[in-house]
């Protein structure tokens, strides 16, 4: 039975409550904000339990009921008010179908109606109105309800503060999880002024939620919410929960329902805002040249930041050179240029060092540019130009006490190593530069070590050095060197250095055994024989004994063989000499000079060969040593640490004063600096030690470049007296040169086989000089040099190297190739072979050859492989009265076809024709013709005539036989006819010769079987 109708006062209260709820100003504002014609339905909410939707099983959601409000909240309120006043609210005890929206057909929300749904009657509406008792519902339940299909009905409990989303709005939580998949170049205007509540965003950077007065969008029907499995919160502040709290009061008694009250509801909702994940973009380049421009990255989404990575990868063996065309970044933006070496990233430059015109080169074939910005507007801009350049191996490390000769640093180049006199090479004598993403040498650089002992036969010149101590030595050594010169020659030993420990011993014998004459014993004399030792014969034996754990003793003994009656060849370290007689005969004069940075000491600059009977030099060779201090006034010079190349001694205090022209200044280039932490090198700007210091260094340091402001420069070096305790360094090398006094960089020289261009008329700071090479040459080094703030160039000038390789001609379709050298150096050959079914057009062998001008090229163009059918010659056919040998339909170029004629015919034309390659291919001659052979014809005629005569004779004989036979046959036939036709008139009556008196009987046989039925008529004579 339907419930009793409530009093009029209760109805008026409920109508006022619904008018406030459904017709609030907020709802009106949201309704006005919608575009014209927007029929977006209101969000779904729940009906009381016990009212499942018609047509759907009630077991799935027994406590849920989802209806959808029509677009106009005011219209819904008016209609519902009329229903309530009429007392026709729907009942909760009956199946309540969805209310049809009171809108025109074209303005209705685009939701499919469930089948067989009918409009509710006024009685049902009134019954449902009286049973409106919201029940407490958890947030999870609300989300589950949002996942149910919404019907086209009036949402009786729709909140006026909620702005519904259009049909098909995605689940906000799911949308947030898929935020990273949004296109990076999304128009920022789309998110500038949101017309719908912001969806729930979930990202790795989630901040704490705050309370706002906006409801989140409902999820898409059919998609479960992410919080379905979560427990319901302790207190729910949703509109449904606020109404559920008063359910018992609303249903308590009829008297309470009849009271005339006005209810106001405050609805608060919670929106979780999150920090957006970064918008990522990645661009890859593989062209040999191009630009990286800030316009390549997408527009920045609102309230977000952008991360872009630009990767440039070129062919193996080439690097990437970046040149800064323009850079204008905002504060907080990051622009980093990184070298990529496998998994390792090396920062080559960043935004603090990037200036226009700067050049950065990658060490491998890949370079990466990383850009990051947090700006909402005013993004920084940059433009970089990139181009490929040929990578090269690093210059191989020169072995200590050795040298290296490099033929080419590019791929395929070789480096040859050799050791100085007295040292032996340990390792490969030759290394090859291997082509790779980062070119490298084929193996580690070798080292040079001094051996412990050895034998030298047919000696001419050499050294005996203190042996190198390996790491696993036990400290004791006993070394024997035997030096044997050719017969008739003598040996001279020159002690360039001899420092023996107290317990170490050295002996020198003039012979092969230690029983020979003793020339020197370190235990018997304390002086060093700097004048040298001469052998009595052609052999010298040197013995060295040491018990030290490390190489406490050092010595350097030079030996040379010379003819008897001549002086030995002199020698000076760190210097040179000139001689009047290269055979060093009696009267020869030798003059010595020292290398820059060294001075002569311990001997004269000139010596002479004297004594005819036993020639010798009138004095010992001098020594060239790096001095401690001095005054230098040359235009250019060298300053070395004391005792260079040997380590400096402790307790040194040296001062060098350099002076150049009055209108000039000094450029000082510190090329090598290796000091201990207690040793100090100070550079002063001026002619005396004063506070104006250009630089002060200790320990290890890289190359330094300094300029003086005056024509004078002072260098002071102090080594710690306690150097044996704290250790000491190897020393330093400094070059200086006189330069003009101005505010510009020094001019750079021209390069051979190339030219240079200058960006400014004056080489001021920021000016650039660009070098280029002539055709056929590659530039080695940086092609663009920039004048830096300290008036020095960014790098050394490059040089042009002749190109000795060809570019790869490429692959040929349908073929394979065999390359003799993967580097494609001059002389490399490439052999192309076509696959089966294809024929090669062009030369199969290409060779790289060098030209006087221009780059090396290949001997011919790249061939092509074409199918056999496209090049084959068709069969020309058969000549009349002839045939072919080995008949085929198609003939490849180069194949031949042979013709033959039948007997009696003669072939006119080429017996064999050949298929000639062409476009199209053709035969080298026409089809031959088979003509009758005249000799054969006459012979055949004679044979025919002879055959005719023979046949005539045979015919005559046949006639002679045939005529009598014919006559006899005629006679017999006539007799037979006479007997058979004329027997009735004969008087001779013979048995069985007369016909019977009965007529002849004609019998026609019939057979039922059609197979045996012949249809013939047979005659039989019957005698009775």
From Swiss-Prot:
Compartments reported by the entry: Endoplasmic reticulum membrane
Entry's Gene Ontology cellular component terms: endoplasmic reticulum; endoplasmic reticulum membrane; neuronal cell body
InterPro entries: CUB_dom, SEZ6_CSMD_C4BPB_Regulators, Sperma_CUB_dom_sf, Sushi/SCR/CCP_sf, Sushi_SCR_CCP_dom
Extracellular side: 29-958
Expressing tissues: Widely expressed, including adult and fetal brains and lungs. Not expressed in all lung cancer cell lines.
Cleaved signal peptide residues: 1-28
Annotated function: May contribute to specialized endoplasmic reticulum functions in neurons.
Region (O-glycosylated at one site): 147-161, 176-180
Pfam families cross-referenced by the UniProt entry: CUB (PF00431), Sushi (PF00084)
Organism: Homo sapiens (Human)
Bilayer disposition of the protein: Single-pass type I membrane protein
Compositional bias of kind Basic residues: 110-120
Sushi domain sequence ranges: 391-450, 565-626, 743-802, 804-867, 871-932
Family: Belongs to the SEZ6 family.
Transmembrane domains' residue ranges: 959-979
Glycosylation sites: 49, 311, 328, 350, 435, 458, 474, 514, 576, 618, 674, 742
Lineage, highest ranks first: Eukaryota, Metazoa, Chordata, Craniata, Vertebrata
Keywords, comma-separated and alphabetical: Disulfide bond, Endoplasmic reticulum, Glycoprotein, Membrane, Repeat, Signal, Sushi, Transmembrane, Transmembrane helix
Protein name: Seizure 6-like protein
